Each structure stands twice: as C-alpha cells, then as structure tokens.
Amino acid sequence: MYDIVGTNNSILIANVLVLIIICLLVVIVGCALLLILQFVFGVCGFVFKFVCKPTILVYNKFRNESLLNEREELLCDNV
C-alpha cells in the first residue's frame, strides 16, 4: 500500500515541529527573563526608595547647612 506521508514530507514536518518547539522555548525563556528583570528592578526601586533616598536627603541637608555656615563665616570675617 501507499504511504500517505512520504519520507521527505515526514522529515519536513518533523523539522517544522522542532522549529515551533524551539520558538516556543525562546518565547518562554524570554518571558521568564523579563519577569526576573522586572523583579530585580522592583527590588532596586524599593531599596532606593526606603534606604538610599533618605540617606541622600540627610546628606543634602547637612551639606546645605555646612554651606550656610561657611557663608556666614565668610560674611562675618568680611565685616
């Protein structure tokens, strides 16, 4: 009897299926990497918001006070 699918066609179908599976794996891995990156950026944003930002604000406050003190000293020295 005759085969419905010839040898060349079966190899072609197998190659197409392999390509489809590879594409699906690439999409799944890409989505997983994007989720991981989103998590990392979220954690970094959280750390910056609650740890680094207050530290920067305190630093700026003391720096501004120091500059004001220097300005007052310079003004007092000139008088």
Swiss-Prot record:
The chain crosses the membrane at residues 17-37. It is found in: Host Golgi apparatus membrane. Its main location: host cell. Residues 1-16 are virion surface. GO terms for cellular component: host cell Golgi membrane; membrane. InterPro entries: E_protein_bCoV (IPR043506), E_protein_CoV (IPR003873). It is a single-pass type III membrane protein. Keywords: Apoptosis, Host Golgi apparatus, Host membrane, Membrane, Transmembrane, Transmembrane helix. Residues 38-75 are intravirion. One of its GO terms (biological process) is viral budding from Golgi membrane. Belongs to the betacoronaviruses E protein family. Plays a central role in virus morphogenesis and assembly. Acts as a viroporin and self-assembles in host membranes forming pentameric protein-lipid pores that allow ion transport. Also plays a role in the induction of apoptosis. Homopentamer. Interacts with membrane protein M in the budding compartment of the host cell, which is located between endoplasmic reticulum and the Golgi complex. Interacts with Nucleoprotein. This is Envelope small membrane protein. The lineage of its organism: Viruses, Riboviria, Orthornavirae, Pisuviricota, Pisoniviricetes. The gene is E.
